[in-house]
Amino acid sequence: LLYMYNMKKVTLFATGIIMMSCAQQQQKLTYPETAKVDTVDVYFGTEVPDPYRWLENDTSAATAAWVEAQNKVTNDYLSKIPFRDALLKRLTDVANYEKIGTPFKKHGKYYFYKNDGLQNQSVLYVQDSLDGEPRVFLDPNKLSDDGTVALTGIYFSNNGKYTGYTIARSGSDWQEIYVMDTETGKLLDDHIEWAKFTGATWQGDGFYYSAYDAPVKGKEFSNVNENHKIYYHKMGTPQSQDKLVYQNQAYPKRFYTASVNEDETILFLYESGDGRGNALYMKDLRKPNAPFVAMATDMDYTYAPIEVIGDKIY
């Protein structure tokens, strides 16, 4: 009897939601008109119309007005859903619990990410020992007023002196690299822009990173990204002085990233984009002007170094 009673309550609740949903669906939605423009590309002799390309210009006044009109239609509809506030409250209650990531050890200290419950971004903590007192190492929530700057990577220099970190703003693929003093937490002047699909690989008094040329102003999110490059940034110098380490203009759509072994003697280059895996190259940093030497050139498999011991790479 109790089971039947509970099932009856569930059925009535579900029926109520369905009835309210049907009432919502009866509302007539009048969508704003979307202008069409005469834009045509020709590919191998075939004309391909693209009448809505003007919407790719996400910084134009016309696009902003279109988005505002679309949002008004959406928000007017959603605001009339009677159980919306109750649903939001329930989802908020369910998500509001402490979340702690797996700790990792670097230079004798322990780091971990923690979210108190409803924070936009998880905070990186550090403690001196396993039973030490945790303290905030880097709080990405303080990197913007609205909490939309995400910490996408953390990179400690091999000597522990510097900590590089990458951020992304508002969900963008573009990344920026910042560096701080590991001991004091002081943010240093080194700042890299227009990085993408990259980390910061330390070697000596600087690091390698991957980036594209700066896009045309106003087209930061619509420009085609081509010619991915690897640079070396020396600490204390502006990005304009960074050394170009590798590019391959014969394959403008491919991606290039780098890593360095623990002894900082070998620079590894990963090339991807044409298959499921990556090609792998190496460069001996002990030899001035040494070239990159191919280790594996097909991209059907994933290749990565395990260790460098003497003159052998595993």
Language-model-detected regions and their locations in the chain:
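Positively charged n-region of N-terminal signal peptides that target proteins for export
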Residues: 2-10
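Beta-propeller folds
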Residues: 13, 22-314
